[in-house]
């Protein structure tokens, strides 16, 4: 029987041991990597490209039982017999046609070249190479050219290791799964519901593995945007956060977590825990209030004063049960320079047979 939380040990295994099976991969055709090969990268590679090289080397050692050298590439060095990691800035001629930062192009011949639009794309290309070799159960890859880009971004994820607990190996594993952003519950600067967390350190560590960090707001929002002291209050919360942590990619706002004292008559007008006995109307966090756009514009303006390109994500699943007319009315009045996150089918009901509702 496992100990409590022993599953965490598996969550820290980025590369699976013993994937190589010579009885399987030797029957396939393609380019084979052996211990005469090297992994090379630009001499001025940034943290993400260096991480890509070292992660790929670890994959070959742990999963393929091969020990490859990783080193800076010399000018004019041939591509054959090497896995060359680069990006569009270093080798424009090898760049993918896509412009997305995480896009990449993989060329496989007598050598293997992975070129990303940015180093993040190169890293994702290395992950693709790892997945293909894992499927083949050996150090072999199909010859040819492959170009890929993410279907969408960001792909955010909470920690599966423990809420707001992000060991490096767990961040790396999430990146291997195609995630490109971490969500951290934020009650205040460097404070999560579970206590202190150095946000800037998390941002730094995540960035080195090609990941962004979003603040999932747990801030109290007791001020209506029309209150005279509302700007000063939200400056002391969201403004203080982005002033001190400009590396945050953005903020995610969910009704249940950021409810404010809306003046929409369809709601109680107060926070959930402040409801008076007998009040049957929903709290503002659970209704598409007409004044959410006012609140959003106030907070957004404060955040973007410190980070002009901050992604502002507004998530609407809390009022999915409300009639469509009210939900659409809110969407039509939201500012267009934010990201709207919706949860499809959450409140849909299906009737597979008479008397059964799911």
Identify the residue ranges that each predicted region occupies:
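Solvent-exposed, polar/charged alpha-helical surfaces in well-ordered, non-transmembrane soluble domains
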Residues: 54, 58, 62, 124-127, ...
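Structured segments of extracytoplasmic/periplasmic soluble domains
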Residues: 55-67, 129-132, 185, 244, ...
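Conserved, mostly hydrophobic/aromatic
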Residues: 60, 118, 157, 174, ...
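Extended acidic/polar, glycine-enriched regions
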Residues: 75, 98, 105-149
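Catalytic-core regions of glycoside hydrolase
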Residues: 134-137, 158-160, 180, 186, ...
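An acidic-aromatic substrate-binding cleft motif
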Residues: 138-181
């Amino acid at each position: 029987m496992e100990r409590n939380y022993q599953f965490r040990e598996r969550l820290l295994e980025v590369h699976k041991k013993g994937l190589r099976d010579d009885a399987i991969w030797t029957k396939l055709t393609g380019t084979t990597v052996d211990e005469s090969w090297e992994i090379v990268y630009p001499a001025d590679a940034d943290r993400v490209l260096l991480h890509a090289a070292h992660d790929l080397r670890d994959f070959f050692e742990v999963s393929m039982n091969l020990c490859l050298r990783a080193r800076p590439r010399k000018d004019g060095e041939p591509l054959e017999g090497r896995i060359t990691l680069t990006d569009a800035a270093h080798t424009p001629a090898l760049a993918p046609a896509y412009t997305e930062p995480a896009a990449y192009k993989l060329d496989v011949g007598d050598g293997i070249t992975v070129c990303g639009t940015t180093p993040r794309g190169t890293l994702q290309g290395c992950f693709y190479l790892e997945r293909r070799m894992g499927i083949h159960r050996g150090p072999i890859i199909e010859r040819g050219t492959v170009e890929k880009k993410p279907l969408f971004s960001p792909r955010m994820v909470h920690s599966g290791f423990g809420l707001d607990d992000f060991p490096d190996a767990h961040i790396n594993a999430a990146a291997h799964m195609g995630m490109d952003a971490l969500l951290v519950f934020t009650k205040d600067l460097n404070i999560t519901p579970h206590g202190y967390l150095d946000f800037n350190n998390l941002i730094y560590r995540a960035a080195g593995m090609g990941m962004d960090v979003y603040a999932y707001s747990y801030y109290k929002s007791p001020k209506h945007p029309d209150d005279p002291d509302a700007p000063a209050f939200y400056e002391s919360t969201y403004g203080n956060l982005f002033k001190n942590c400009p590396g945050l990619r953005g903020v995610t706002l969910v009704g249940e977590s950021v409810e404010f004292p809306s003046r929409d008559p369809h709601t109680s007008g107060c926070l959930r825990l402040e409801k008076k006995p007998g009040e049957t109307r929903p709290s503002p966090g659970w209704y598409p209030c007409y004044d959410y756009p006012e609140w959003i514009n106030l907070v957004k303006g404060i955040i973007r004063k410190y980070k002009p390109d901050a992604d502002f994500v507004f998530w609407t699943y809390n009022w999915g049960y409300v009639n469509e007319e009210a939900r659409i009315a809110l969407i039509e009045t939201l500012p267009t320079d934010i990201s709207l996150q919706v949860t499809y089918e959450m409140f849909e009901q299906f009737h597979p047979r008479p008397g059964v509702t799911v």
